[in-house]
Amino acid sequence: MKIREIFKKEKNVIRAMWIVALSPFALLFLMLTLAALGVFGRMPSFEELENPKSNLATEIYGDNGHVIGTFFVENRSYVQYEDLFPQDSAAHITLGGENVPPVVAALIATEDVRFRNHSGIDIPSLFRVGVKTILLQNSSQGGGSTITQQLAKNLFPRDTVRNRGKISRTMKLVQSKFKEWITALKLEHNYTKEEIAAMYLNTVGYGSNAYGIKSAAATFFGKTPDELNVQEAAMLVGVVNAPTR
């Protein structure tokens, strides 16, 4: 009798382990199915994902090739991933066996330590995200959102929920989170990790009307992104979560 009970307990444990292991994949399949059926409303098209729109500043160059003025609604200029690397290779940061720019290393360490290992969604953080978003009614970009999810939210902002009732607000936040996950998966499919990191740094606001890492580096330190040291890069990444206005 005792042997049967032991086998029964082991069987239940194995079953529970399988349920835990397969639940994320079942959730992903459900999300994609509901998205295909239009339950989450309009999703960004592949064309929009391949050519995201942002307000860029118009830069005026002098004969010497230097910027002499800008016109903008948002002070934003794009920079490529390769242009984030310091000219001195000794200033490069080694992360996971790869050289990365200091500002990208600071971003990963601060926002998404498993950035290079997931496909847009950090499965171990799903439960924390669920508790924070649904139970605590906290819609901030922290609490487990990956860099790719935050990029999805920056490129395709959520609808406001301030004037909704509690139930309606909760349902809208859940719907927005599902859309954010699906968009993150699509971004990971369309872009490399390096491109995603650069896009994120180019789209976020750093305060003082500085949008994008190029404008932020110039505004706060009078430098280009490749001239930032580790401390300056860490400060700019930290400012993203609490920018000055």
Model-predicted segments: where are they?
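N-terminal type II signal-anchor transmembrane helix
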Residues: M1-D63, I68, I134
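Peptidoglycan glycan-strand catalytic modules in the bacterial/periplasmic cell-wall system
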Residues: Y61-R245
